[in-house]
C-alpha cells in the first residue's frame, strides 16, 4: 500500500472530520492494530479477490451514541463466516479495540429517536490473486462508520411492503455441501441486490424467500419474525435455522427478549399462509431493527403496534 493512502492523525483530526461522512480504519500485515485511512483514495489492489470475485466476509452493525450493539454476536458470526471461507480467524479483541477506537473518532452520526446512530461495517477480503489457492497471508480488514440513512430509520415505523419470491434452488443442510457457504455472510451480495431492485420495480420494498415447497426462509437482507396469539398465548416464530439461512443476530436478540417477557418461541416450518394469518410479521436486521411488514404480495397484513 502506498504511503499516500495513510493520513497522519493530526491531519485527520483537523480536516478529515469536516469533509468526509465515513470514517475508516484499515488492518493489514503492516498495521495489525489498525490505522485511520482516507476512504477517498485507493486502498486495495486492482486484483483483490474481494473486489473482483466477492471473496470475503463482512458484518453490518448499528452504533447508538457511539456504542455498537451486539458487537460480540457480530464478531462470533464473522469468525464463523471466515472459517467457512478458509480465511484466517479474525482476532476478536483486536477488532473490538479497533471498533471502539473508530467510534471515538467517527464523524457525526444521524440524530434519531434513539440518539446518534452510525452504520458500522467490518469487511474482510481474501486479498490479491495469489492468496486464492494458497494459505499465504493476504487478507486485509476495513472497519468503517457512517451515518444511518433516513430511509432506513423511516422503515422502522412505516414498515415495508414485501413480495414472496422463490429462492431459485432447494436449500440443503449446511454441512452437506460446505462449498455452497450456507449460513456465511459473504461479500457476494449481487443476488441480494438484484432481488431488491426486482421488487422495488414492482412497487414493493423487500422480498421474503421461499423454497419450491413454499417454506418461508428469510428476507433478502433480514430475518423473518412471525407473531401469533394462540389460545391466549403469545408465540413468536422464525423459520427453522437450517437450509442455508443466515443466523440473524437481531432475531436472536429479539427471541431472548421475548422469552424473558413470557412469549413462547417456535422455529418453523412456516408457510406463506402462516404469514397471511398471523398477528404480525417483521423483517429483522441490525440497522433497520424490526420493520413491520404491512403488505405481502399486495395484501395488507395484520399489525398490532402493542406486539
Q: What positions do the PLM features span?
A:
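Short, acidic/charged, Gly/Pro-enriched secondary-structure junctions
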Residues: 96-131, 146
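Compositionally biased, low-complexity intrinsically disordered regions
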Residues: 1-2
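Helix-start/capping segments and mature chain N-termini
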Residues: 8-93, 97-101, 130-307
Amino acid at each position: 500500500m502506498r504511503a499516500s493512502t495513510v493520513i497522519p492523525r493530526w491531519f485527520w483530526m483537523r480536516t478529515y472530520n469536516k469533509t468526509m461522512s465515513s470514517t475508516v480504519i484499515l488492518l493489514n500485515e503492516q498495521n495489525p492494530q489498525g490505522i485511520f485511512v482516507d476512504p477517498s483514495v485507493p486502498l486495495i489492489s486492482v486484483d483483490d479477490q474481494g473486489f473482483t470475485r466477492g471473496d470475503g466476509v463482512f458484518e453490518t452493525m448499528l452504533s447508538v451514541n457511539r456504542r455498537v450493539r451486539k458487537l460480540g454476536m457480530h464478531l462470533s458470526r464473522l469468525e464463523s463466516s471466515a472459517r467457512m471461507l478458509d480465511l484466517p480467524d479474525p482476532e476478536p479483541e483486536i477488532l473490538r479495540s479497533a471498533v471502539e477506537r473508530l467510534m471515538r473518532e467517527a464523524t457525526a452520526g444521524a440524530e434519531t429517536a434513539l440518539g446518534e446512530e452510525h452504520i458500522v461495517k467490518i469487511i474482510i477480503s481474501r486479498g490479491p490473486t495469489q492468496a486464492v489457492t494458497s494459505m499465504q497471508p493476504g487478507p486485509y480488514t476495513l472497519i468503517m462508520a457512517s451515518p444511518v440513512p433516513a430511509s432506513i430509520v423511516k422503515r422502522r415505523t412505516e414498515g415495508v411492503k414485501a413480495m414472496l419470491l422463490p429462492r431459485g434452488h432447494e436449500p440443503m443442510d449446511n454441512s452437506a455441501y460446505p462449498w455452497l457457504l450456507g449460513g456465511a455472510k459473504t461479500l457476494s451480495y449481487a443476488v441480494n441486490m438484484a432481488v431488491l431492485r426486482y421488487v422495488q420495480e414492482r412497487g414493493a420494498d423487500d422480498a421474503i424467500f421461499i423454497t419450491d415447497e413454499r417454506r418461508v426462509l428469510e428476507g433478502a437482507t433480514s430475518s423473518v419474525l412471525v407473531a401469533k396469539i394462540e389460545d391466549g398465548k403469545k408465540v413468536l416464530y422464525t423459520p427453522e435455522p437450517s437450509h442455508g439461512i443466515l443466523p440473524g443476530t437481531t432475531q436472536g436478540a429479539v427471541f431472548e427478549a421475548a422469552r424473558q417477557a413470557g412469549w413462547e418461541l417456535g422455529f418453523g416450518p412456516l408457510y406463506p399462509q402462516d404469514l397471511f394469518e398471523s398477528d404480525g410479521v417483521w423483517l429483522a436486521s441490525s440497522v433497520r431493527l424490526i420493520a413491520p411488514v404491512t403488505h405481502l404480495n399486495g395484501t395488507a397484513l395484520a399489525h398490532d403496534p402493542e406486539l
